[in-house]
Design a protein with these regions (language model features):
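Conserved helicase ATPase core of P-loop NTP-dependent helicases/translocases
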Residues: 46, 56-70, 177, 188-219
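Conserved segment of the helicase C-terminal RecA-like domain
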Residues: 116-130, 210-215, 228-295
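Conserved two-lobed SF2 helicase motor
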Residues: 69-88, 208-227
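Inter-Walker segment of RecA-like/P-loop motor cores
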Residues: 42, 48-86
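Conserved strand-helix element at the start of the C-terminal RecA-like helicase core
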Residues: 29-44, 120-123, 160-185, 189-193
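Conserved interdomain hinge at the start of the Helicase C-terminal
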Residues: 20-25, 102, 106, 112-113, ...
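Long, largely alpha-helical accessory region at the distal end of helicase-like NTP-driven motors
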Residues: 285-312
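Post-DEXD/H (motif II) to motif III coupling segment of the RecA-like Helicase ATP-binding lobe
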Residues: 31, 96-151
Length: 312
């Protein structure tokens, strides 16, 4: 491991980790941040180009590539981070994704191999603290406390949910069905899914953020740091298909999504709706207190070995 300075900024949702990373990056002459979602990379890109000259900022995702000739700052999905850049600052968001079955090997590769010349910053959940401290004993840990309170609201029918609510579903069919029900009962809802085109997805986010509609129906994509002005998050289901099988969400995943309710000093609430089974009192206490089981396993593929095999 390199001896360049590494800082891990860890804590639950709504703790300002991403904001800190952006401001820290811009304090250096050059930098890059890898995000878990295309939509989040685009959101941060739009914010940064309002602060500094657009010709200094690049956006690189699987869908969009805006790379000015003299770009100094690179905002990317983790998979799209260019590995040949020598930059002062490198950040990786939602670093606990190293434990994800599907994408974890990419995050772990960035954890092991991507370094800023002056500072590397890892942002994410406290659940990964112990395992990454074993990888490098010189990492500086910064703990961030949530700025607002998160409480359980129990079960509510969709017809009785309040405005500034996101309803979470785990299939396109369910997302569209719930959105149609809200349109009939409440007047309108925006939709956010990873499968939407960038233009459509950005337009749907703006539809909600501008106040044109009061409700959002989304997949668990919003759990990965997308900053929406939400007071409530309701789950229509606590099971998802993970690419291999239908499984229950673990408490950390529920907490990550539920934690999108409440912004800055405004408290948030989470609950369930429809046929979703009740969350136990014990689990509610753990989610409200952001107390989740620590990560014990990371996924990794030796990228150097893979490249060697491909060259043979």
């Amino acid at each position: 491991m390199t001896k360049h300075k590494i800082t891990a900024v860890l804590g639950p949702t709504n703790t300002g980790k991403t904001h800190l990373a952006i401001e820290t990056m811009l304090s250096f002459d050059s930098g890059m941040i890898g995000f878990p979602l295309r939509l989040l990379a685009r959101e941060v890109y739009d914010k940064v180009i309002k602060k500094i000259s657009v010709d200094k900022v690049a956006l690189i995702t699987g869908e969009e590539k805006i790379i000015p000739t003299n770009a100094k700052y690179f905002l990317c999905t983790v998979e799209s981070m260019p590995i040949d850049k020598h930059l002062d600052f490198v950040g990786v968001d939602e670093i606990q994704m190293c434990a994800d079955h599907e994408r974890g090997h990419i995050f772990t590769d960035r954890l092991l191999n991507m370094r800023g010349e002056k500072l590397t910053m890892l942002m994410g959940s406290n659940t990964i603290k112990n395992i990454i401290s074993k990888l490098d004993g010189d990492i500086e840990f910064i703990n961030r406390e949530r700025l607002s309170k998160l409480t359980y609201a129990g079960h509510k029918k969709i017809s009785r949910i309040n405005r500034k609510t996101a309803i979470i579903a785990f299939s396109a069919e369910e997302v569209y069905a719930i959105a149609e029900l809200i349109r009939r009962q409440k007047g309108g809802a925006a939709i956010v899914m990873g499968s939407l085109s960038p233009k459509t997805r950005n337009a749907q986010v703006e539809l909600y953020q501008s106040g044109d509609v009061d409700f959002l129906v989304a997949t668990d994509a919003i759990g990965m740091g997308i900053n929406m002005d939400l007071d409530y998050v309701f789950f229509s289901n606590l099971k998802k298909f993970d690419g291999k099988k239908l499984r229950k969400l673990n408490l950390s995943e529920i907490g990550q999504i539920a934690g999108r309710a409440g912004r800055y000093l405004n408290d948030g609430s989470f609950g369930i709706t429809g046929d979703c089974k009740e969350i136990t009192a014990e689990d509610v206490e753990l989610i409200e207190g952001h107390k989740f089981e620590e990560i014990r396993t990371l996924f990794w593929r030796n990228s150097n070995l893979i490249l060697t095999i491909l060259k043979v």
